[in-house]
């Protein structure tokens, strides 16, 4: 993977390239970023950058190499070339010097699973679900209700692989995705992290710092990865996914900096959220209890992910309305959304809109924890009615 294929994160990309070109990259690196930040993609791009043949040294200059050994001069590119044999192998996840570790499951009693047992599934997952999370990965290998784990057997396999000589590049690279699944068994890797064989690069890719072993945290060079800007996701949708601009402008703010969520919204949502929201608001403020019950009955069947997407859409429009009221300037959103946001301002004062946002956030939290959707949306309907009941009754057309 090329750095240029990853949306946003310009500062992180420049930092990683600078760490390599200035010989300041630790042999143990921790990329820490929330779901959908592109942390795994940055790790893949870094590994490809390190093995890229166009970044190989030329003549001796007496300086230390990436791992403290004598090196030769080289002009480092700002990205891997993408065309040399090493880059092509790295892009296909088949480079013999780049190893992958990730949570696995036991498929049969007595098995001692290793990541290499699932390497074909891993390649398919990275290609088809590029910003998937651990749940997506485990479901793709048939986990269902089974817990994922990085096993003692896997740790031993990592140590064995990285003690072998490199095949082609001069480096041996491990990308371990979701080290949160290591547990205390991760202490088996401490000696490898502290005293790695020459030419070894360990890249840990994590989401939750609180679930990492303190002994691993203290022995790795930390690179924090922020959530993406809405404009970066919008540009990625338009330029890489060929999404029409209006649709990209709607999806980007709803994803809240999460590329996985943007991917889900793009591929899994065929609902007309604007029409559903219009029907709900008219039921609340104009049409009365019978219409409210009908709406709740219909939309409680949407499914948890779509219900969360719908609430996120409503929050997005409310936030835009509040921004228009407070700043006097509309955010960059689709024309139909701008019109809806202005109608919301006529429906309620900004304080009321902000109160509705709080209720929607709370409802989304409870949906995530499997609340009964019919009860939840009926209660939410009543709460929203009481928040705006002092306003004149109008229709949202």
Model-assigned labels for residue ranges:
Residues 1-78, 85-86, 198-201, 207-397:
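Charged, glycine-rich active-site and insertion segments that engage polyanionic ligands
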Residues 2-5, 9-184:
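Clamp-loader machinery-focused feature within the broader ASCE/P-loop NTPase space
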Residues 92-94, 196, 216:
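Short, structurally constrained coil/turn elements
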Residues 160, 191, 218:
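Conserved adenine-binding aromatic site and its adjacent loop/helix in ATP-hydrolyzing domains
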Residues 164-167, 195, 239:
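Secondary-structure boundary motif
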Residues 171-173, 177-201, 208:
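Conserved Walker B catalytic segment
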């Amino acid at each position: 993977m090329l750095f240029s294929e990853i949306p946003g994160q310009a500062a992180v990309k420049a930092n990683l390239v600078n760490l390599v070109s200035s010989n300041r990259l630790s042999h143990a690196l921790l990329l820490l970023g929330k779901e959908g930040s592109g942390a795994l993609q940055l790790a893949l791009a870094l590994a490809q950058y390190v093995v890229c043949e166009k970044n190989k040294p030329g003549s001796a200059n007496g300086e230390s190499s990436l791992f403290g050994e004598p090196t030769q001069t080289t002009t480092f590119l700002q990205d891997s070339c993408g065309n040399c044999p090493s880059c092509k192998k790295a892009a296909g996840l088949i480079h013999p010097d780049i190893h992958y570790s990730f949570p696995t499951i036991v498929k049969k009693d007595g098995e001692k699973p290793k990541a290499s047992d699932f390497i074909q599934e891993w390649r398919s997952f990275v290609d088809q679900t590029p910003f998937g999370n651990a749940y997506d990965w485990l479901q793709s290998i048939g986990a269902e209700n089974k817990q994922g784990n990085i096993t003692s057997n896997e740790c031993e396999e990592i140590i064995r692989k990285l003690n072998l000589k490199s095949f082609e590049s001069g480096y041996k690279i491990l990308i371990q995705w979701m080290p949160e699944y290591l547990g205390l068994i991760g202490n088996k890797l401490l000696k490898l992290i502290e005293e790695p064989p020459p030419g070894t690069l360990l890249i840990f890719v994590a989401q939750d710092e609180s679930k990492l072993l303190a002994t691993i945290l203290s022995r790795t060079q930390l690179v924090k990865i922020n959530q993406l800007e809405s404009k970066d996701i919008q540009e990625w949708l338009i330029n890489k996914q060929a999404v029409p601009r209006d649709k990209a402008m709607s999806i980007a703010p709803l994803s809240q900096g999460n590329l996985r969520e943007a991917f889900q919204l793009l591929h899994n949502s065929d609902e007309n959220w604007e029409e559903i929201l219009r029907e709900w608001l008219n039921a609340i403020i104009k049409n009365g209890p019978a219409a409210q019950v009908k709406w709740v009955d219909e939309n409680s069947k949407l499914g948890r992910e779509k219900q969360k997407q719908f609430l996120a859409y409503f929050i997005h429009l409310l936030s835009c309305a509040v921004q228009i009221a407070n700043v006097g300037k509309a955010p960059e959103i689709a024309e139909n959304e701008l019109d809806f946001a202005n109608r919301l301002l006529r429906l309620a004062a900004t304080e009321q809109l902000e109160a509705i946002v709080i209720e929607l956030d709370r409802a989304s939290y409870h949906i995530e924890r499997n609340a009964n959707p019919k009860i939840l949306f009926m209660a939410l309907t009543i709460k929203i009615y009481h928040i705006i009941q002092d306003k004149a009754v109008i229709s949202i057309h």
